[in-house]
From Swiss-Prot:
The protein's name in its UniProt record: Cytochrome b
Family: Belongs to the cytochrome b family.
UniProt cross-references to PROSITE patterns, sorted A to Z: CYTB_CTER (PS51003), CYTB_NTER (PS51002)
Cofactor binding annotation: Binds 2 heme b groups non-covalently.
Protein topology in the membrane: Multi-pass membrane protein
Quaternary structure and partners: The cytochrome bc1 complex contains 11 subunits: 3 respiratory subunits (MT-CYB, CYC1 and UQCRFS1), 2 core proteins (UQCRC1 and UQCRC2) and 6 low-molecular weight proteins (UQCRH/QCR6, UQCRB/QCR7, UQCRQ/QCR8, UQCR10/QCR9, UQCR11/QCR10 and a cleavage product of UQCRFS1). This cytochrome bc1 complex then forms a dimer.
Binding residues annotated for a ubiquinone, in chain numbering: H201
Cofactor(s), names only, from the UniProt record: heme b
InterPro entries: Cyt_b/b6_C, Cyt_b/b6_C_sf, Cyt_b/b6_N, Cytb/b6-like_sf, Cytochrome_b, Cytochrome_b_C_euk/bac, Cytochrome_b_N_euk/bac, Di-haem_cyt_TM
Gene Ontology molecular function: any one: metal ion binding
Residues binding heme b b566: H97, H196
Ranges that cross the membrane: 33-53, 77-98, 113-133, 178-198, 226-246, 288-308, 320-340, 347-367
Length: 379
């Protein structure tokens, strides 16, 4: 008799995705981050759902409702800081996941890669809107500054910004719609994740060598399920440590001051995971140019498959490309640091240099080094 997991209409979908899925035998721990992102998404949806039961999206009561959650709701403080720090964990896993894709050439599966870029944009939008909800100083001014960037779009600028605000400034209408979208987007992200997995399972996973592994496959369960569970435990331990010992570590002190349109904070900045893009935005003196650079800093990932010039898929056997890749990582760390600094000398010039390097490495140096490596292979 055939096992029910192979015949039942629902169970066979789960079986072919997580149990009998053929997986390359050489996958390293860098392949754990996809499943870790799934756990992060689950934690975010659950904690967010319970917080939404107590939160009020009104400018008069939003800040107080968050205080009420932390003080009066059973384990409300835990839910709030799991959500806030869970977002940081989400982005750590997300950036490592994208970095893995760049290093090992996973972007050659173009459908999976493009859905991944869509997912990145959706998660960034969700996080931005979530940061506005506590209605602290940085929430209000962050929303004002970022939504104002749309005024750089010619001809429709004023109409577009006021349409998004729902009025002539960031106010009650803005907060209400941001809450509605913040609640909705994680479910759209979940749907996109399913499409992401659908396309991935069409082609099968890449592996560290970048060489087709069809002759050497192993079942996903028990080998990679056990490996994933170890990853879950490590990540959840790190998250619990952060939440229980230093929940305020990654937040901004200004966001514990209620929003006041009459007082501007000394340094308006987003959460740490957006600082690299914020630094690129600020490095260009022109408003429209800055907005285009900001969008391109993420959208550039979409043209990475086109720029792949190497005869090898992975960087595993390409030492010159490896050096460039780690230089790119160093540039991203530099941009993240600069994004949190005030706009003054020497931070301005460092930010501009790092921004130029970021685009230069991806657009020119990587393809050129790949061609050099191709030539050296012949030699």
């Amino acid at each position: 008799m055939t096992n029910i997991r192979k015949t039942h209409p629902l169970l066979k979908i789960i079986n072919s995705s997580f149990v009998d899925l053929p997986a390359p035998s050489s996958l390293s721990s860098w392949w754990n981050f996809g499943s870790l992102l799934g756990v992060c998404l689950g934690v975010q949806i659950l904690t967010g759902l319970f917080l939404a039961m107590h939160y009020t999206s009104d400018t008069a009561t939003a800040f107080n409702s968050v205080t009420h959650i932390c003080r009066d709701v059973n384990y409300g403080w835990l839910l709030r800081y799991l959500l806030a720090n869970g977002a940081s964990m989400f982005f750590i896993c997300l950036y490592l996941h994208v970095g893995r894709g760049l290093y090992y050439g996973s972007y050659m599966y173009s459908e999976t890669w493009n859905i991944g870029i869509l997912l990145l944009f959706a998660v960034m939008a969700t996080a931005f809107m979530g940061y506005v909800l506590p209605w602290g100083q940085m929430s209000f001014w962050g929303a004002t500054v970022i939504t104002n960037l749309l005024s750089a779009i010619p001809y429709i600028e004023t109409d577009l910004v006021q349409w998004i605000w729902g009025g002539f400034s960031v106010d009650k209408a803005t907060l209400t719609r941001f809450f509605a979208f913040h609640f909705l987007l994680p479910f759209i992200v979940t749907a996109l994740v399913m499409v992401h997995l659908l396309f991935l399972h069409e082609t099968g996973s890449n592996n560290p060598t970048g060489i087709p592994s069809d002759p050497d496959m192993i079942p996903f369960h028990p080998y990679y399920t056990i490996k994933d569970i170890l990853g879950f435990l490590m990540m959840l331990t790190a998250l619990a440590t952060l939440v229980l010992f230093s929940p305020y570590l990654l937040g901004d002190p200004d966001n514990y001051i209620p929003a006041n349109p009459l007082i501007t904070p000394p340094h308006i900045k987003p959460e740490w995971y957006f600082l690299f893009a914020y630094a690129i935005l600020r490095s260009i003196p022109n408003k429209l140019g800055g907005v285009l650079a900001l969008v391109m800093s993420i959208l550039i990932l979409a043209i990475v498959p086109t720029l792949h010039m190497s005869k090898q898929r992975s960087m595993m056997f390409r030492p010159l490309s490896q050096c460039l890749f780690w230089l790119l990582v160093a540039v991203l760390f530099t941009l993240t640091w600069i994004g949190g600094q005030p706009v003054e000398h020497p931070y301005i010039i460092i930010g501009q240099t790092a921004s130029i390097l970021y685009f230069l490495i991806i657009l020119f140096l990587m393809p050129m080094i790949s061609l050099v490596e191709n030539y050296l292979l012949k030699w």
